[in-house]
């Protein structure tokens, strides 16, 4: 049997070693640039109103581009995407439509049906599907009906409109395959699923991002590029730094024509002033949909061009269109023909081989399909992200200054300079990086593209992202907001995963560790300002989980000490300790830092468990609660939320054999045990023979009491995972009076019923993959220590007792069931829509939602959150190992 690496792995190696630039091109084009903070130059800071969907077809973007299932280079200079028209829509379908935050009854929401079906890390093969209705798209109906609905009602979706009745729609599949890093084959397959022949206009479109309208731009060419008619049925695109590319197209299937214009704003339409260019961004729309042929260039040149196919497709029939985007230095023997199809087959076979080596072979076919789809979504969600904060704040040279108030947003982040391909939470709903989401992305990515995972973890720690004070940027709406500090966990996790069978990348670990020291210090100085080792932290990514907005001062003027904030900092210490000990293997200096984090962990553990009433542990309820301190009094907020389990996450295994070489560390630990016994006694347990230690915030009794609630189906245990809020609050809502107002916390298993944080998120009941993943992971840590000596009742009161490893496996199965078809073919995440169970053109399609209804499993929020919901791939890959001690899967 050959031991040679598979071709995709070899491409990854060539790219990492800069032998061949396979990552130059990829599906890095955003699904939405309109309505983003980057494009918002208003005084009010309302990006949805300032740059709505209706402007997107006519207005040049300043900081990026978007398109339908498109492709671009790593600096988003030249873009390729689809445009479609069914002859009935009022506009070309050039980009995905969705409701803005104010329009949706649960915040912003994409109202399209599209699916990321396959992808390889180098984008040597990618496939996606868009379902395009044959009737007029119901833009206004979606806006009006959702506007009529309250937050306590279901969202009105595209399928609810009846537009897909009688299967009157097209399946539009797009595939990309790379022959070389700069020779990209494109195949469009359009299938008429309806009962009658139907017409469709298909416009593969090539355009340059507008970098010439804004004056001198850092690192960008300001020379206007050009796209013109080339020889032998092709477009020729010339760019100062990218070079020359040709888009060849088959001159068949309706004898296509080429339409040319410029990617410049239609000022006349939007602002009622004269256009600076004769041909503007929306000219192709005007020519095709409105019949205004004079709108496009008669000279066959511009910065945007489309190949216009007019197709009539019989019922049940399929048409295939072939294109090829190549650098001028390439000279393929035959652009199309048999070799074209052979190369697609070859790249797909190579993708199969690549994933066969990265998906657990013992998984059944249904699980393998979910894992592959999760990886596809993760790779399609890589996006070119560009923002120079100082330039955004001050405005562009030669342009009017932004209005007063504009520069107030992120005013403390003038150093931030982003010009990278990054993994996005969701390419439409969240087309911007989120620091804590990114950590989960990188852990998942490390299985298939380890260099990208490491690079993205490091880039947020670099001086052009990280603040000089050590804070990591949260997200573009407010870089200074606080996200859970999971970055050290991700760094350690990625390092350990890649350590198995490979040479450890200590350079990566050390680079990250040094910068994380700055971030840790920032947290301690800012969020533990009283020095009592109980932390605040604000909303910490859990949005509406508290009684009030935790990112703002308390309405009664008190101080909030958070169970999750304190738990996260203990979690931080655990992973910094693990990294310091690993680095100490080759540099004794790190022993001192390991001692520092052991000591700090002990201090946090003592504080959070304070027996004198000063801590967050409630002995009566056996739970961790947030605490309000006001006028010398302490009051627990008795909200049974997943935040109360976060101190449980701070646990790791320390074996004598692993630390015996660190004499300084061991000596210091013994000193602490002798002279600060309360600190280590409360956080360090040892096995019977004294060779293995468990470092944990929790005692065994506390762990058992927490797990009693965690595994209670009347509280946190759902058929589909761990709820973010106890079901107890459904009948017993918490009422808290502060500042003359009453705040209520109750159990809401699906979408949120308030407008907090935009209304499109809810941590008061639903199931969230990232927290479930961390709970599963730490259960394995506890299992490695306690083994058979600790058995729990799962579910609580069921009479079924099992080890923590077995409980973790059971919980993992519940999470997996969200995505797996049941006996009737229904995936719970798809809700009650029967098409996904019964229709052969729908039942293999899988969406990865932001969160899930705790009682039904229905997907909620963003529908393409791969993103952190791709972590289900890791859970499935772990399937055979839940009760084993396989190294590398936990931070022992």
Describe the residue ranges of each PLM region:
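Basic, low-complexity intrinsically disordered segments
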Residues: 68
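Transition-metal
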Residues: 65
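Active-site-proximal polar cores
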Residues: 72
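Acidic, mature catalytic/reactive cores of soluble proteins
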Residues: 2-62, 75-78, 83-892
